[in-house]
Amino acid sequence: MSRFPRVYAESTIARMNKKLALPQETMSLLYDYFEAFANLYQLLPLKDAYKIISRQNKGLITLDEFIAFSEIARHEDHFYYILAKDELYLNAPKEKPIDREIVHSCLVDIDYEDYYNMADHQAGKPLKILPKQELLKYKEEMYIADTTYVRAMTNFLRTRLKMSEDEINYTISDFILIITCDDKPFDAVSKMLDRKNILMTKSQLEDFIKLFTDLSNNTRMPQNRGFTPLELSANRGGQKVINSISFGPNITAAFKSGEADIEEYRKGILMSELPEKFKMDMLRQLSQIEGKNTTPKKVGRNDPCPCGSGKKY
């Protein structure tokens, strides 16, 4: 198992390009596709890459020309690699060039664990093929699709949290990065907001949870081979969804110091329209912050209703 393919000298690449003799316009389009594949899927077999390109550009390139191009790209310096299984696994048999994969550098630059995890996540899932115009937008490293859910979150950050336009752009980018890269996006985003010392009222927090859940479930994921979680759920009849959120240390400290009213938050959670899993998890955390037993106390016949209305239960 070798580390990475060697980067060839410019003179060698020039000779390979001259031998291939494709028009510059075609070469540029192929590079755009490979960059888009690396960003959108992070891991994509060359066979699938050729299928997409051929389907969207009839007669553009033959299979032999595609393989020759991939050999050139394999030995250039990009943010992705063209790798074979025998370069990723011990004792793997040597593969034909068309059996190699486009692999984003983030999966293999430190070690191969991220690659193995991505391969496991993608296994058995169908491939989402976007229309050509939309697909090629992903050649930009941090392209963010202009969806209803992105616009809704942007509006929340602008009008409810009073962020500047620069802060909004950075924050949305961070959210998308967390959603696509983290196994527990709500925990990660809670820690991110905590680091930035962003505290929300109970109303803001309730709205944020809904918006972030929608954003998460409607963002294209490399793990899902380009599908959003909701698309894949509809396609396969079920998909893991987010069902919890953790309070960060600054928010916890605000509760303990009295800066944030824990009882008001509790009432807001109970009266909210959040999913029950969210409610129960957040109430459990509030009880832990207070130092109480997390086991709910049995409510008696004449005890006040836990909704905070003051009525008898």
Predicted regions and their residues:
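Acidic/negatively charged segments and metal-coordination signatures
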Residues: 1-313
